[in-house]
Regions:
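A beta-strand edge to alpha-helix "cap/lid" segment located at domain peripheries
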Residues: 59-69, 73-161
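Short, low-complexity N-terminal intrinsically disordered segments enriched in polar/charged residues
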Residues: 1-22, 26, 30, 149-161
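Hydrophobic pocket/interface hotspot
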Residues: 13-16, 28-29, 36, 51, ...
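A solvent-exposed, acidic/Ser-Thr-rich amphipathic alpha-helical stretch
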Residues: 26-27, 34-78
Length: 161
């Protein structure tokens, strides 16, 4: 049985990515429930304010060098998905990243309660870190190292005023 599409949740996802494309973290996180759970290969699992702060940090660190495109948005009453592409310079190496991401969402009371991004970590590591990333990007060692770095950055991040 096919689930019925929900235009309000489709619009919620569209608003999230439109805000991201315009570097508006406050508008992005207004789409999130306060009890949001976010997960991706770089940060692992983040909850609540940590998930919200991550988006502000990524936008601030991009220093205007971030291009977001999105599409293939689908949503029902309880879940949704989108495909999106982030183009940016990796802050640690200055290398160009073009990351193709699939997002899955769960909704509660008109907000996003769960957001899971998946992407090819090996390909991302190769773009971000060059030869070392291509060589080691498939290993748990590299995943843990990148995650540790990302979480340290998030823990030390102070939003721009």
């Amino acid at each position: 049985m096919q689930k019925t599409l929900n235009s309000n949740n489709i619009e919620l996802i569209q608003n999230f990515y439109a805000a991201f494309a315009n570097a508006n973290a406050a508008q992005m996180v207004s789409c999130y429930d306060d009890k949001i759970t976010f997960q991706d290969p770089a940060f692992g699992v983040l909850h609540g304010n940590d998930a919200k702060k991550m988006w502000q940090m990524l936008i601030d660190k991009s220093e205007g060098n971030l291009k977001i495109t999105y599409g293939n948005i689908k949503a029902t009453d309880t879940s949704g998905s989108a495909d999106w592409v982030a183009e940016y310079l990796f802050s640690q190496t200055g290398r160009k990243i073009i990351n193709h991401i699939n997002a899955k969402f769960e909704f509660k009371d008109g907000k996003i309660i769960k957001h899971t991004d998946t992407f090819n970590f090996w390909k991302w590591a190769g773009q971000a870190l060059g030869f070392k990333g291509y060589l080691l990007g498939w290993t748990n060692f590299m995943r843990k190292r990148v995650r540790g770095f990302a979480l340290r950055e998030l823990n030390h991040y102070k939003p721009k005023q």
